[in-house]
UniProtKB/Swiss-Prot annotation:
Protein function: Catalyzes the dephosphorylation of 2-phosphoglycolate.
Binding residues for Mg(2+): D8, D10, D186, D190
SUPFAM superfamilies attached to this UniProt entry: HAD-like
HAMAP family documented for this protein: GPH_hydrolase_arch
Official protein name in the record: Phosphoglycolate phosphatase
Organism encoding this protein: Staphylothermus marinus (strain ATCC 43588 / DSM 3639 / JCM 9404 / F1)
InterPro entries the UniProt entry points to: HAD-like_sf, HAD-SF_hydro_IIB, HAD_sf, PGPase
Length: 238
């Protein structure tokens, strides 16, 4: 029986991978999981206030992971950092050096550890080239920082943290075994937490690499794939 289910947000709970519009059917599915006693965890690279705000307004009561795993929200009186480092210096450096290609996410003023860069519209067709350029520059100059690309933003994150580390801490705190968990995502960046779960799920339109690694690939994309896997879990628990 699944006791904890972890979900990425952008591209997973949205209507598709190029939109930030939530799939309302997916939100209903998450609520249904909670009503059936499953702890629902939102896992995101968004700033923590965004993740917590979303969690509260859609009616979830479980923990929330923000900043690519650097911060965990358990409640108003318990917010835990999983790293002592910050990528801010590297972020400011990249912003100055590669300003032609990228700009800072508006969420960065609400971040402490993980920082995000958005690719300018005129360069979106070269997103992977720009990502590779920045990744090589940052990881060579700042050995304590790793660089990832979600398809929405380029993230600079302390190497000693991640979505998987944060999810494992939550599992330990709640006394939940790997065999009792499920992880769902759309980006290869999500593999970091999905690999820590028993049932590893990629939505139909996920990155090819994530689809290859996952145990289950839904037949429907993004939020509609979430509805599909939740219905399967509740109807016939693995």
């Amino acid at each position: 029986m699944i006791r904890l289910a972890a979900f990425d947000i952008d591209g997973t709970l949205t209507i598709n991978r190029s939109s930030t519009v939530l799939c309302l059917e997916a939100i209903d599915a998450l609520r249904k999981l909670e009503k059936n006693g499953v702890i629902v965890v939102l896992v995101s690279s968004n700033a923590l206030p965004v993740v917590v705000g979303l969690k509260k307004y859609i009616g979830l009561s479980g923990p929330a992971i923000g900043e690519t795993g650097a911060l965990i929200y358990y409640g108003e009186e318990e917010i835990v950092a999983t790293t002592k480092y910050s990528a801010k210096q590297a972020y400011l450096d990249v912003l100055e050096k590669y300003n032609e290609y990228v700009y800072g996410s508006w969420q960065n003023m609400f971040r402490l550890h993980d920082y995000a860069l958005k690719i300018r519209k005129q360069y979106l067709s070269k997103d992977n080239e720009i990502y590779s350029l920045i990744k090589e520059y940052v990881e060579n100059k700042y050995p304590y920082i790793k660089v990832g690309y979600s398809g929405y933003a380029i993230h600079l994150t302390p190497k000693d943290t991640g979505k998987g580390k944060a999810l494992k801490q939550i599992m330990e705190k709640h006394g939940i075994r790997r065999e009792e968990t499920m992880g769902v995502g759309d980006s290869i960046m999500d593999w970091e937490f999905i690999k820590e779960t028993k049932i590893k799920v990629a939505v139909a339109n996920a990155d090819p690499e994530l689809r290859r690694k996952a145990d289950i690939v839904t037949t429907k994309p993004s939020g509609y794939g979430v509805v599909e896997i939740v219905e399967k879990i509740l109807d016939k628990p693995p």
